[in-house]
UniProtKB/Swiss-Prot annotation:
Motif DEAH box: where in chain: 391-394
Gene name in the database record: recG
UniProt protein name: ATP-dependent DNA helicase RecG
Matches recorded under Gene3D superfamilies: P-loop containing nucleotide triphosphate hydrolases
Domain Helicase C-terminal: 457-617
This protein's record includes keyword Transmembrane: no
Natural source organism: Borreliella burgdorferi (strain ATCC 35210 / DSM 4680 / CIP 102532 / B31) (Borrelia burgdorferi)
KW rRNA-binding (keyword) present: no
Enzyme class: isomerase
Ligand binding (ATP): G290, D291, V292, G293, S294, G295, K296, T297
GO molecular function, one term: DNA helicase activity
Length: 686
């Protein structure tokens, strides 16, 4: 049995009863597998006996020492809860240690007895004494139970100690060692000098030495990253091949030539990569990602033109009606001279318009379909669907994506991410995808200038904005709330829209938020694009997709309430032309350390990939990319940032394996085949 199959109940393990199981459940430990993979958060190195350091140089230290008790005395207020020990350590003069709230141990620390003790000791200059409150002690012996070892320290909850968890883990491991089997192929162990799975699990929980502990960590990191990538790659390797297409670039080249600007080198490379995949005998699965304003949407559109030219249909999915409408309008303008039939399909369409749209999709007269979730519906039938483009892919589930692909045969799929994803994370999360990166911005774009300002300096910001408005430019204001809340002392869209109408009386101010009807949101955005609205007050609903080249200023109030990637996305709504743009972050003090870090990072960095990496380090992948539902993202031991080199190595290893595994041992191939089958049989989603 593989480790992922050890989903047996915990009751009985190490004498666990219902109360103990409940406590482990509070730590998200629900079965034997979870318990085995509940790795320590740190370790106490009790291998070597130490003497107290020179207090003139060191005021605090974690250490294990040995001392003999020479005397003791209770002290403190009338309750006398504290204990003062006079002790003699190795080769040292007698000195005193304070044990806070430990007077009840007077009869344990008997005079002339020798003890091991491990604790965080702190030196107090005023009393001239070393003190500790939480410690572990044991009567001195040649074979101590908890000393002269490296002990694991686990995350805890009420009623549990690291010692108890160690006992439970020990019995769970014995069970696995008896009935389990490895899921690490030998070629990985030999090439990277890894431990066996059994040895790695034993050493991670009960290290025999610091050297073996590091080897165990390395092994389990490789294993976790390997399995993550292997499962998705294995699935894609079993995709049936199709007949190759012989696509032309004629229409693509005509449209590119008609553009009033030149594509960036990254855009050209991405289009070529996609074109190669579309012509191959294997359906494409590719992730297209780039920084804010890098031109991903244009690349996606252009890449579909060879298929439309050949008589196939292309579906372009957006997460909201507003964004779908914007894409439709922009693409219509680009394709107008080329007689390409387009259809918009959203849930907010009137019944008659929706019926017409569905009919044009069904009979094949529509080559490019832009829409929202409505494209997924059973009533939406395609005549010749060949290519699916999904914008903001994380907002659509795997099942939805597969349903859309199943509306055609051998359908190619391109996923786009609004948030730049660090390379190491993309290679792991999307192990079954090829990845195209667009890092360069279109020519002529100027770097956005970012300013930080404390609340109370609004008038200075308003004065700056007036100068931009006088030039005919437009402005955004973003707030964390739609309406006022009794829970939070935060500015909101409704009230600030009224105030800003007073402040900027000579200009047109309107607001946009998620609770407005779809048709009203579309009307407001049309007015903003046509410069009938000068100032748009909104929530973070504008963070993705809004594209108004004439808008040069963005003001975010209560900026400390927003995440790094969200702030970067919001900033990306300006700077979308050759006009100099400005980003104002108004924050309210006091700031948390994380809040200070976010604001400092966003001010000093314009690179979305760098910002995403810092956000990944801060918040983890689930929160950052909206992927909380994907349980496999909760890594047990690997780290997407710190272990990026291993991620790349494993990716390259799997490239070789899936390209030609004839050089690999049959035992390894059989192991991985069985592993994949057992994973599917266990009901896992991959």
């Amino acid at each position: 049995m593989f480790l992922h199959e050890f989903e047996y109940e915990l009751k009985g393990i190490g004498g666990l009863g219902e109360k103990g199981v409940e406590r482990l459940n509070n730590l998200q430990i629900f079965n034997v597998k979870d318990l085995i993979e509940f790795f320590p958060v740190k370790y106490e190195d009790r291998q070597n006996i130490q003497t107290f350091p020179d207090f003139s140089k060191v005021k605090s230290c974690d250490m294990m020492t040995v001392f003999t008790v020479l005397g003791h005395k209770k002290f403190g207020d009338s309750s006398k809860k504290n204990l003062k020990l006079t002790v003699k350590s190795i080769n040292e003069e007698p000195f005193e240690i304070l044990l806070f709230n430990r007077a009840f141990l007077e009869n344990v620390f008997k005079i002339d007895k020798k003890f091991y003790i491990y604790s965080k000791f702190t030196y107090n200059d005023y009393s001239g004494l070393w003190s500790c409150s939480n410690f572990d002690s044991e009567v001195y012996s040649d074979k101590p139970e908890r000393f002269k070892k490296i002990l694991p320290v686990y995350s805890l909850t009420e009623g549990l100690t690291s010692k108890k968890i160690s006992l439970y883990v020990k019995e769970a491991l014995e069970y696995f060692f008896k009935f389990g089997q490895t899921d690490i192929p030998r070629f990985l162990i030999e090439k990277y000098s890894l431990l066996s799975l059994s040895d790695a699990l034993k050493e991670i929980h009960f290290p025999s030495s610091l050297e073996m502990l590091e080897k165990a960590k390395k092994t389990l990191i490789y294993r976790e990253i390997f399995l993550l990538q292997f499962f998705s790659r294995y699935r894609s390797s079993k995709i049936l091949f199709r007949e190759k297409k012989d696509l032309s670039k004629d229409l693509l080249e005509k449209v590119v030539s008609s553009l009033p600007f030149e594509l960036t080198e990254d855009q050209k490379i991405s289009i070529d990569e996609i074109f190669f995949d579309l012509n191959s005998s294997k359906p494409m699965n590719r992730l297209l990602q780039g920084d804010v304003g890098s031109g991903k949407t244009l690349v996606a559109l252009l890449s579909g033109l060879p298929l439309i030219e050949a008589g196939y249909q292309v579906a372009f999915m957006a997460p909201t009606d507003l964004l779908a409408r914007q894409h439709y309008d922009n693409l219509s303008n680009i394709l107008a001279p080329f007689n390409i039939s387009m259809t918009l399909l959203t849930g907010s369409l009137r019944k008659k318009d929706k019926e017409q749209a569905l009919e044009s999709i069904r009979n094949g007269t529509s080559g490019l379909i832009v829409g929202t979730h409505a494209i997924f519906y059973e009533s939406t039938e395609f005549k010749r669907l060949a290519y699916v483009i999904i914008d903001e892919q994380h907002k659509f589930g795997v099942v939805q994506r597969e349903e859309l692909k199943n509306k055609g045969e051998g359908v190619d799929m391109l996923l786009m991410s609004a948030t730049p994803i660090p390379r190491s994370f993309a290679l792991t999360l999307f192990g079954d995808l090829e990845v195209s990166f667009i890092k360069t911005l279109p020519k002529g774009r100027l770097p956005i200038t970012t300013y930080l300002a404390r609340h109370g300096n609004e008038d200075k910001v308003y004065e700056f904005l007036r100068k931009e408005l006088l030039k005919g430019h437009q402005v955004y204001f973003v707030y964390p709330l739609i309406s006022s809340s009794e829970k939070f002392e935060l500015k909101d869209v409704n009230n600030m829209c009224l105030k800003l109408k007073e402040v900027f009386g000579e200009y047109v101010v309107d607001m946009l938020h998620s609770k407005l009807p779809s048709d009203l949101k579309e009307e407001i955005m049309k007015n903003f694009y046509s410069k009938k609205v000068d100032i748009l007050v909104a929530t973070s609903v504008i963070e993705v997709g809004i594209d108004c080249p004439n808008a040069t200023c963005m003001v975010v109030e209560h900026a400390e309430r927003f995440g790094l990637s969200t702030l970067h996305q919001i900033r990306g709504r300006v700077g979308r032309s050759n006009l100099q743009s400005f980003f104002f972050l108004l924050y309210k003090e006091p700031l948390t350390s994380a809040g200070k870090f976010r604001l400092k990072t966003i001010k000093e960095n314009l690179d979305g990939f760098k910002i995403a990496e810092e956000d990944l380090r801060l918040r983890g992948p689930g929160n950052l990319f909206g992927l909380e539902q994907a349980g496999y993202l909760k890594l047990k031991i690997a780290n997407f940032v710190d272990d990026r080199e291993i991620i790349v190595l494993v990716r390259e290893e799997l490239d070789l394996f899936f390209y030609d595994n004839s050089a690999y041992d049959k035992l390894d191939i059989d192991l991985l085949d069985n592993l994949f089958c057992s994973y599917l049989n266990a009901g896992r989603s991959i």
